[in-house]
């Protein structure tokens, strides 16, 4: 019995590592899809919603690890949107967005993990709540970063974010649909995170 449980534990850890690595790579890949707009030059990109996709699919722990791995790789390689490093982003107006990932992912992931076994319509609605709440956290922390690094007041920081809201809202709807599709195809993927 001990051999079987230890081998199943090792297999679970191995698959967790694989999921984390795959989602870190996905977040990195989606960072190269960027269009600069707005007052502060912060780009519209898929990376902001991709980290929340990691939370919705993997849950709070593995989603956080995937996001952390992405940011760790970014210390050494230019994997953030626009070909920037994590260190560069921390010294720029985007500091709030980068730090927000570490808050938004666990929040969205906890909600997703708790509702994954709900009926499909309820799950879809609550996944949307989780995704948009994570996005709201990114916007609030992003605005704070803009206030400190771009010398904007609260109104200016809020105005700088306006061009991003429509596209981010659409992106998040797509990410929620993808997450629900993944959980439909792989119904046990998130269950161990909800325990």
Language-model segment annotations:
Residues 2-64:
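Hydrophobic transmembrane alpha-helices
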Residues 22-30, 51, 55, 66-74, ...:
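Alpha-helical transmembrane segments in multi-pass membrane proteins
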Residues 33, 57, 76, 84, ...:
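Helix-loop junctions at the membrane-solvent interface of multi-pass transporters
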Residues 31-43, 71-104:
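Interfacial aromatic-anchored transmembrane helix boundaries in multi-pass membrane proteins
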